[in-house]
């Protein structure tokens, strides 16, 4: 089953999602859906996001569940700069995990 999580739903007046703390409730909802066996579509409609926000939203999932978690996520209505941030965060956290395994 697929679940969509809209980043606009809780912060309609804010255009740029920037604080780590503001990403935590979305990440918890994503984790809940993943634990239920669902794939998750993260909808960025009308939103920009900072690296800190994306790291808390996606990077924390990669650190906790491993890089394979990305196969259960998809990103919708995502601006190009946010796509670049997502790719960077995923690669950075996957590298961090692999270095931990070597150490």
Predicted ranges, named:
Residues 55-57:
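A structural signal for leucine-rich repeat
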Residues 1-48, 59-103:
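STAS-like cytosolic regulatory interaction modules
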């Amino acid at each position: 089953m697929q679940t969509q999580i809209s980043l606009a739903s809780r912060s309609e007046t804010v255009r740029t999602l920037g604080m780590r703390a503001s990403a935590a409730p979305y990440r918890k909802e994503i984790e809940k859906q993943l634990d239920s066996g669902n794939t998750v579509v993260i909808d960025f409609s009308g939103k920009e996001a900072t690296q800190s926000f994306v790291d808390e939203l996606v990077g924390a999932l990669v650190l906790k569940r491993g890089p394979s978690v990305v196969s259960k996520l998809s990103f919708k209505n995502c601006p190009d700069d946010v796509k670049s941030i997502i790719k960077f965060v995923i690669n950075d956290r996957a590298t961090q995990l692999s270095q931990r395994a070597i150490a």
